[in-house]
Amino acid sequence: AASMQKQYPGNIFDFSVRHMENSEAINPNDLADPDSLNRYVDGGGYGLSPLGYFMRGAGPVDESEMPFQNNIEAENKADLLIKPIAQVKEAEYMPHKETFLLPDTTDEFIAEAKYNIMKYGAAGCAYYSYDPLYNMDKNSFYNNQRGTYQNHAVTIIGWDDNFSADNFVAKPPADGAWIIQ
């Protein structure tokens, strides 16, 4: 999206999350399709699945083509045959860091993440989502537990270095937060 915004300044792009989600899932009615992935719409995914969606030319498609719906019913494959509005030709991959949000995360890695968000528009990451650590009033989450697995993927679209550490259930060592979608 960042590259498209540079090519088409002033345009606002709204890509269909529903199309990507369904393109990466299987429909029980399509079980004979050998190209289907082995998961359902509400069954989670893998960190690199969106990259595959873009690189194989399945998307992105405009939100107006397949608007968001809050349901878990998979679309039929025929409904997903929408012409993408752009072609992704390359992607940047940052090395996986287990310590991305832990107190000993290096300033160098945080600076690298911020640089990539500025350059490319966003960065994907995964974390361990655990409801008792979520502050619903401040819409904030911080997990200070080591050794937890990752069960949720998000896209980092920015940061706020002044977001108070007091806004979290588990208090981080300093102010600041990633802004995610």
What are these regions (language model features)?
Residues 19-173, 181:
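Predominantly the structural core of cysteine protease catalytic domains
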Residues 1-9:
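Alpha-helical support elements that line or immediately flank enzyme active sites
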